Amino acid sequence: MVSYFTPPPSAPTALLKAKTCYSLWFKIYNDFPKAHRYTLGGKIEDYFLGLLENIFISIYLPPETKIPRLVIAISKLDGIKFFLQIAWENKCISNEKYSSLSEHLQEIGRMLGGWKKGLEKKTPPPK
């Protein structure tokens, strides 16, 4: 039987890396102090899900509409970094876990920035 459906585009490395980072966060979230799990932990969780959602949606958008969605993803990433730092400063996350997550987040940031920059070079500015 011949399939007439086009396969979905392969997932960009940024999405795969974000999924891996979210898996790390998910394990940390379960051990998050109960007093802060649904406030600070919930905020970080929401930003992570927003990051994943915006990267995923960006895959399927036409090039001219990807850039605004990537800007949102980058701002979600910045929010994760900010609230994770607050969690670490308040001893909700160990140094090792914070360091590991931070390394992943920095790499995701470089990937998203490169993706955005590449699109800006290819996409003509709107008239």
Cite the ranges covered by each PLM segment.
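Amphipathic alpha-helical assembly/interaction segments
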Residues: 1-127
